[in-house]
A protein has these predicted regions:
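Regulatory sensory and allosteric helical modules in signal-transduction proteins
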Residues: 58-59, 74-111, 115-119, 124
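Interdomain signal-transducing alpha-helices
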Residues: 44, 92, 117, 135, ...
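Intrinsically disordered, low-complexity terminal regulatory regions
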Residues: 1-72, 234-252
């Protein structure tokens, strides 16, 4: 027997799987985040022989959503749990634990959800993990597997799932960090362009800072366009935001 009661060949298989997933994760880091996560859970999930569907759940701002899945059925299974506010994928995320059931219809805590999952999607077995992200200040996440077979997931599958969950957590963390950096850059870029546009209008029309900003805001309202977009054009071309003079600016 090997460590934790596993045979040495089981341990070697887990190590081989971990090495393979590490290489795959490195390859996927620069792909589109959604596609990368789908590839990871699709290929990694093949290690769990009886797993029919897999998905990744995130909870942000009090709202659950699925950011990657291997099939529309997986999305439906998640969505039904979100509607109930319970189920393996929801509870694993909220309670920071793993949930395994060999027959979701027999679980008292998830009635009548279990019957609904079985009737709508044929689901019987479910396995869900909380993903431990590098930054959980705004988002937490989980990895979910489901099967149409009873008692589908073996102890070895549970260990394989833990290995996959580790790599999914890294990839989700990288994706969220990229999104955060992108949003921060966009915000900084917008603020910079608004500042430049305000300066241009102040110089061209001898306006105060507040009057110049009001001109941009008024143009945004009248043209139904984002203020940042109008500011970008003014900053780039030096043109007025629309064809009326500074006398139209509310002076207060």
């Amino acid at each position: 027997m090997g460590i934790n009661g596993y045979r040495s060949d089981d341990t070697q298989a887990l190590r081989a799987m971990a090495d393979s997933l590490a290489s795959l994760t490195d390859d996927l880091r620069h792909e589109d985040p959604e596609k990368a996560l789908q590839n990871l859970i699709g290929r990694g999930g093949q290690e769990l022989v009886e797993a029919r569907w897999a998905s990744i759940t995130v909870l942000r701002g009090g709202t659950f959503r699925t950011i990657a899945s291997t099939a529309p059925t997986a999305d439906g299974v998640d969505r039904l749990q979100y509607e109930f506010g319970a189920g393996p994928c929801v509870d694993a995320v909220l309670e920071d634990t793993m949930y395994l059931t060999g027959d979701v219809t027999a679980e008292e805590r998830w009635r009548p959800l279990g019957e609904r999952l079985s009737a709508a999607y044929g689901v019987r077995s479910m396995l869900a993990y909380r993903l431990h992200l590098l930054d959980e200040s705004a988002t937490i996440a989980g990895l979910n597997f489901s099967s149409d077979q009873l008692d589908a997931f073996s102890p070895a599958d549970v260990q394989r799932g833990k290995v996959l969950a580790t790599h999914c957590a890294l990839l989700v963390s990288a994706s969220l960090a990229r999104d955060k950096a992108t949003n921060l850059f966009k915000a900084l870029q917008s603020n910079r362009e608004i500042g430049v546009a305000v300066g241009v209008l102040m110089a061209h029309h001898q306006l105060t800072r507040d009057q110049a900003f009001d001109l941009l805001r008024l143009a945004s309202q009248r043209t139904n366009r984002k203020l940042a977009d109008i500011a970008g054009e003014v900053a780039e071309t030096g043109a007025d935001p629309f064809d009326f003079g500074p006398e139209a600016v509310p002076l207060s």
